[in-house]
Amino acid sequence: MGSNLPAQPNLRVTIIAADGLYKRDVFRFPDPFAVATVGGEQTHTTSVIKKTLNPYWNEMFDLRVNEDSILAIQIFDQKKFKKKDQGFLGVINVRIGDVIDLQMGGDEMLTRDLKKSNDNLVVHGKLIINLSTNLSTPNTNQANGLHRSNLQSSTSSGLVPQVTAPHASPGPSQLDPTASNPSLNPQRVPSTTRPSSTVAPVNGAAAPGASRTNLSSFEDSQGRLPAGWERREDNLGRTYYVDHNTRTTTWTRPSSNYNEATQRTQREANMQLERRAHQSRMLPEDRTGASSPNLQENQQAQTPPAGGSANAVSMMATGATTAGTGELPPGWEQRTTPEGRPYFVDHNTRTTTWVDPRRQQYIRMYGQNANGNNTTIQQQPVSQLGPLPSGWEMRLTNTARVYFVDHNTKTTTWDDPRLPSSLDQGVPQYKRDFRRKLIYFRSQPALRIMSGQCHVKVRRNNIFEDSYAEIMRQSASDLKKRLMIKFDGEDGLDYGGLSREFFFLLSHEMFNPFYCLFEYSAHDNYTLQINPHSGVNPEHLNYFKFIGRVVGLAIFHRRFLDSFFIGAFYKMMLRKKVSLQDMEGVDEDLHRNLTWTLDNDIEGIIELTFAVDDEKFGERRTIDLKPGGRDIPVTNENKHEYVELVTEWKIVKRVEEQFNAFMSGFNELIPADLVNVFDERELELLIGGIADIDVDDWKKHTDYRGYQEQDEVIQNFWKIVRTWDAEQKSRLLQFTTGTSRIPVNGFKDLQGSDGPRRFTIEKSGDPAALPKSHTCFNRLDLPPYKTHETLEHKLSIAVEETLGFGQE
């Protein structure tokens, strides 16, 4: 055939990219390269693209061909090229005369499915090439080779290669919302986990891109995005959009008839929905917390304290007390400090307090009242909920459960002697535990508000920067004084409402992935985890300390943040060891692969060592999980150790610096030994509160597998959920979805690990077993229980006793 070929090259072949290659290794992505061959005589090889299923080469080769020439392009994995199968990933064969007329000339773009070889190995994906008879332009492979180092990417890190966009980078007005505060620049350098198609990569990082074709990040298959908008992909390959005009991100593509005024109106409407949802959150049975929905519904039937029930609910929401009048209780005395400040001495217990024991505080009482309701509001003197009675002591079990010791009778009890016995009647055990933990937690000296005021003045449109400056300049002891928030240009005194608004707005801003400090989890698009690449901002550790202070400040002053983290984050805050189960919210694919490794014989199937590859700002490193790990093979005998080490590295070690900075700020206000009284689910509720869950909306957006909505089991399930209070519903939501967070637009926007995922109840399991949950898929496996009572009993046990965020 060679004798029939022209003396000079007459066809230029450009191997552009492959898409969706087959992943043969459980844990590693291939290092693909392509080999182009004509008649076995002319062979050209592309460069190797590291760790990706979607390599982009864009390399040109000039060949001598005729119409009968067969162009064969094979894809191999460079890691396995010396193995028996050479890491074969697919091949295409093209007869030149079938696609292009060499005499007439032309230019053809081809997309072909990859085919199997004679070994019949499974292959997958497509190959994109270009054939052209125009050889007048110089072959730019050398230039491409120089540029290609900035285009190599890793699917595992969320980077997808792309031709550099011809569009200019967004201007300073779009990328610098912190011009008023030069120290706060978390977004000045593009994040490698949130790639954008700006032209100049920073620090040699991989040139960002969010498409596998020649589209820039300012356009997609539907056309160009509105001005100021950018398309990006997260570390899981999910497309999202950045609005540089407002410094916000969204999963929804802006419409072609995008109107800024309309969008602003929609944002404000969504913000109002979120604000109302946030301000209605509360803690279970927290006597100084916000009122519960059930309490408000039964408000007319409750026994109103002086001043009316509406006033009582309002005072409960702010933790307010009525003025102290009349004589002091027996055994009490009022004294004055040298500075003239009054304090009170309780000679009964030989203790002192700043709180006037005559002041009345509103608490919730449980048990049947005269109207048959389970909840009443009563006034309770603070002195009765002050120190424990003489001879009593509060202790913790080794599982952090609060109990009380009566040294007078040498007995112990779970019941708080300061609370009426009716408080615990008919209340579930886990709920009494949480309430007691709250009482214990907030009764500690370290959690008492100090005298004086802590003034924080911020601008609404600059709340992140102003809050950073205000909170970081004050000492921890100053932050423990009564918090007084002032919004610039607005009149108003802070009796609780302003501080709630402050934490609501600030949590929306500082946890915004736009700043690269946090990113969305693998579980959904509203729970957060620390961004391991936050170091793109050189001041990131200072911001994590600031965020830790804010979280501690909210807990200290009994306010809630409108943010929710992955379950592993709460475990880390409690210094608990993370497990493979926690990996599900961080990297679902890795979780599945590690689980497969534990459940199967891996000898001769997968080749692993005690090392992992990590890419940071374009630099790829091999990290030993243990000394000399890259030389230690993983076997059936040591695979459990390997899984533990990979889990710890992926969840903890990668963000250790950031997390330690966060905890240093947090522990300045909340001592570590006190917060450890809670478990990880309770800590989520302590930080974010409990939402009022709309059961009708939940039911409306639920799918069934194996069941019909009319089935008795399903009818009983929803009856049970309706009878549960807000905390039980939130715990059920935690159990089935991994978080108590509800999307702002309700259950119709519930997300799973792979995008929108409705809540699902599946008929699965033995009626003698407990229900199971799959949090990444928002699914509840519900056995076909015969009776209403059995279903409620089994479901309650599963929800209340399960450790962590779901069982599977």
Curated annotation (Swiss-Prot):
Record pathway: Protein modification; protein ubiquitination
Question: What Gene3D superfamilies does this protein's entry cite?
Answer: 2.20.70.10, C2 domain (2.60.40.150), Hect, E3 ligase catalytic domain (3.30.2410.10), Hect, E3 ligase catalytic domains (3.90.1750.10)
The Basic and acidic residues compositionally biased stretches are: 275-288
The top EC class is transferase
Record carries keyword Transferase:
yes
* Reactions accelerated catalytically: S-ubiquitinyl-[E2 ubiquitin-conjugating enzyme]-L-cysteine + [acceptor protein]-L-lysine = [E2 ubiquitin-conjugating enzyme]-L-cysteine + N(6)-ubiquitinyl-[acceptor protein]-L-lysine
Q: Where is the composition biased (Low complexity)?
A: 199-210, 317-326
Q: Which SMART domains match?
A: C2 (SM00239), HECTc (SM00119), WW (SM00456)
Q: Which GO terms describe its cellular component?
A: cellular bud tip; cytosolic ribosome; endosome membrane; Golgi apparatus; nucleus; RSP5-BUL ubiquitin ligase complex; ubiquitin ligase complex
**A Pfam entry, by short name:** C2
CDD domains annotated for this entry? C2_Smurf-like, HECTc, WW
Cellular localisation: Cytoplasm
Record InterPro entries:
C2_dom, C2_domain_sf, E3_ub_ligase_SMURF1, E3_ubiq-protein_ligase, HECT_dom, Hect_E3_ubiquitin_ligase, WW_dom, WW_dom_sf
One GO biological process term? regulation of mRNA export from nucleus
All copies of the HECT domain together span 475-808
Polar residues composition-biased segments: 142-159, 171-198, 211-220, 289-303
Extract one GO molecular function annotation from the record.
Answer: phosphatidylinositol binding
Q: Which family does it belong to?
A: Belongs to the RSP5/NEDD4 family.
Q: State whether it acts alone or in a complex, and with which partners, per the record.
A: Interacts with creD.
Q: What does this protein do?
A: E3 ubiquitin-protein ligase which accepts ubiquitin from an E2 ubiquitin-conjugating enzyme in the form of a thioester and then directly transfers the ubiquitin to targeted substrates. Probably involved in the regulatory network controlling carbon source utilization.
Quote the protein name from its UniProt record. Answer: Probable E3 ubiquitin-protein ligase hulA
Give me the gene this protein comes from: hulA
